[in-house]
Amino acid sequence: MDEFQRDGKKNRSWQQCFLYPLFFREDLYAIAHDHNLDRSSSSEPTEILNSNYFSFLTVKRLIRRIRQQNDSIVLFGICDPNQFIDRNRNSYSESVLEGLTVVLEVSFAMRSKHFLEGMDGWKSIRSIHSIFPLMEDKFPHSNYISDIRVPYSIHPEILVRTFRRWIRDAPFLDLLRSILHEWRNSFSAENLQKALVAPGENMRFPLFLWNSYIYECESFLVPLLKRFYTSRSLVYGSFPDRTDFDRKIKHIFTFPVKISTKRIWWMKDSFIHYVRYGERSLIALKGTHLQVKKCRYHLFHFWQCYFHLWSQSYRVSILELSRNYSYFLGFFIRFKMKSLVVRTKMIDSLLTTDLITNELNPIAPIRSILLFLAKERFCDISGRPISRLSWTSLSDDDILDRFDRIWINLFHYYSGSINKDSLYHIKYILLLSCAKTLACKHKSTIRLVREEPGSELFTKSFSKEREFIYSSFSKTRSQRERIWNSDILQINPLANSYTINK
């Protein structure tokens, strides 16, 4: 694949016309087959793994039968786990899917890299917490936020049309269409949500399809937003009231849109910032409520014309920063007006003025965390700690380590919230739940568990992370100082389990 990528950099025509022959390269399926064996080694018996040899000739026949569309339902359907033949056939079908994913990923990576090279100011950041400093810096200058849930009920033909824009290999597209129609159940809301939250073993192909679909949306949407800044003011002609007309029109510009016969009008002084993670996007705008409603209308029009998707109105909600809350990445996002007193000293006088700004206040959903802990049997519905009976068969070190990791992950993820002090109530619940679990295991009481010689580990376990993080901040900064961790790459599992009813 590395050699194939180097050849593609010299001549980009390969990714349009020569993808299908890659399916008949043995090294591609050797990697895919080894990956499947490593993934299934812990779940399948040894005798099946030893007898499940790999034949490249079978893969070639399988690809031809898929293109003929006479065996794809059996090959990519649900196989009987009790039959060895179905297991063997399922292994080959997974190898074909792995090979298809590898070919698409390499081609997609080169195309996206070529696209990003021409996007000035466009940054793709892996860390989740890096989004919040951007919001603190840019969003307070806006007064409205469009909270968007990207449509994910994707029809296979829409994906085929999307790939057809940058792939010209007809046999490859025929093979891709056959596989997509048999995998159409993987594009349901439930499966895509699982793939986005916690990518599993068999979610690599659906996750790639989702990323390519989002990339295609943003490849049209982001340049459209950029033109709001680069477009020139509207040219006016000779009018009798030219002065008044100039005063009205000098802050307005227009640009043509290919998908519509109308022209979209925007305020030239408006601020537009775009942030996305997973299926949630935020567009911050500065303007009137009417302009924001027009933005939502054109967004619906964009999805319908480019991707033939009918998006419901509830998927794009308009929030006023000074009044509404927004739920994003496990936080309640609120902007609070903050007044700053500015004093300017002149030669003969001292001027004092108030500067009013918006301040980002991310709030940790403590109530939702308590409900999740109650669901997982760490406490009851009122927040009273209870013992975790399913962990009593573990060793003391394993029990302490599990409770410790839960608290560390929570504390790291919500270290930037303004209600950080409320997190120590969660720590208290986990602390007592851990003590009750150890007491239940040893048939003792909480007091005896804490007074045992080994209780020092229990005492230090939940406090070491806070002491480590705040050692350099406790003397010079306030305890309410927000800390964003740049090494967090995934949403906390607790944040994904919350059900927010808007």
UniProtKB/Swiss-Prot annotation:
It is found in: Plastid, Chloroplast. GO terms for biological process: mRNA processing; RNA splicing; tRNA processing. One of its GO terms (cellular component) is chloroplast. The keyword tRNA processing applies. Pfam families: Intron_maturas2, MatK_N. Keywords: Chloroplast, mRNA processing, Plastid, RNA-binding, tRNA processing. GO terms for molecular function: RNA binding. PANTHER family: MATURASE K. Belongs to the intron maturase 2 family. MatK subfamily. Usually encoded in the trnK tRNA gene intron. Probably assists in splicing its own and other chloroplast group II introns. This is Maturase K. It comes from Cephalotaxus fortunei (Chinese plum-yew). The lineage of its organism: Eukaryota, Viridiplantae, Streptophyta, Embryophyta, Tracheophyta.
